[in-house]
């Protein structure tokens, strides 16, 4: 036996955090017998808020900065981390979490919406570091290898999910800017030597201002800069509202306001103001005085209506009703509750919303809960064409058939906050007309843009080492799976041109003999891959960070019905491994149902898959043969779970997340008892397999009896640990059997 190995299991938010209360005790009971310790690390939104304000808390309330600790751990060669989805907090989510913590006696400060004093600005800065996708860039010290495991793919082929039919007369389409956006204004430079660059804004009077402290760059680093014109954006949005009305389709906006936490809420706010233009033309000043900020969505305006006097409020509500009557129908997030696509920025996330629409015959829901053709507005044109190509393909060829279609695994460049997903601290809403320049340490101007007040300017970085690692990973996956690999890069786009120079150089250093590796612009790559997909052929997509995110939702949702069933491996650059559980989010709607009905429909398949590859990685790194046996038997148990249809169902009274955990435990114990590679494990798990087999009906009945009534877990963002554990482990018989292991 080797000395005790450690796996870190992240404690996150919402549905996956609830599932952890049930699954983790099972995992810890099993791994103990293989000399593996599974520890938790709290990177939940509430945990990160508490860690940011130790001086506001009592000694007993303080928590370590688990995210910073984990950020260091992933750089160690023996790192082994299971990473569950966490909230990428929008401002409404952040403020709700703060309120909940304050109500529980944690004296964290309020979020300053409009900071005036230095102290308020300092508090706001700390909170802004927690906002948006604050976790993944810290932990992703490697590139991404995402694919559908064979067991999952085979199950989907035998048990196809529903796919909405497409007709040739579908009016659904993507609307994107033809000029003035990030794509059309991009400039790119590769710096030959290590340097630092300043980002300097000069106004029309010649006054200079550094927009942030200088950015350190490594040798060979690619930097890009670009700007979204506010004028061009507003013109585009107004045209699209008009066009949606003329075409009789729903108006919908698809952004990523969580990850792109600086740029996208601003764009979202402009869309709200354009759609509800008469409201802002007539009442803009009064709404601003009431604290309305529609960068947080139209819901923010509605939430602040009670701050207006009765007459003004009535007039605003009448104007809103008039806008709804005059404008195209908005796509709805929740028709029953009247929540539109423009209510909350974090409700409609492009990488999830577009595939869901495509799977649903290209339709979204209107105010009456009916599916309608839709105008999908994606203002920046960098990647919008990929979705248009997919829509065109479905319109021409009909919906995909999950029983015969191939698969599109992804190798994604994401290490060290590559590309747009690392741009937040270099993104600025411009205050006045002028010019922004990027100037190196020697005083050379590397890039410059003329800008106007309200424009959004940003800079991105892509380091050389991650690119080299990404190309190597792509070649490895192409060889191991004997599958063509396509780099989705556009040689006419400045950033992609810079990247291609590196890709070609690194490919030349590798053995690519007998491999089919090609480079296609994103729209062409989409058409090529979709054609193969329909014919049952597989194609690896090798992409940058944003397309990694988009495609690992798009293809899995079409192939498997969900992106939560993906194997998501991050081979860390220093030799460790991070195993992400699926590619979906943290499923707030699942929690809503759980609180109302005590039924959790979250599917932990992503966790099962990640655990198996985590054990396998540990076995390879440490020579722990028991870990390999755990991996093999867990894979077999997972396949059995799928074949026996023991995944969670949607309705209360049916099997839920807790029931699926029981069946996984039963099958895993049976597999361990049946195997002959490790006598100790066989002996340890035979009694458990026997007990669970005998008590199956009793345990399922106990789990089922808990459902159908409201669940109390003592909080949403910061549930009470004891209450949550009790709610998620309601079978005394099952708990006793595990305790004896």
Positions of predicted regions on the chain:
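Extended, well-ordered protein cores
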Residues: 2-269, 278-502, 506, 510-658, ...
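Internal hydrophobic scaffold segments of catalytic domains
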Residues: 687, 694-697
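C-terminal accessory extensions/subdomains outside the catalytic/core fold
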Residues: 719-741
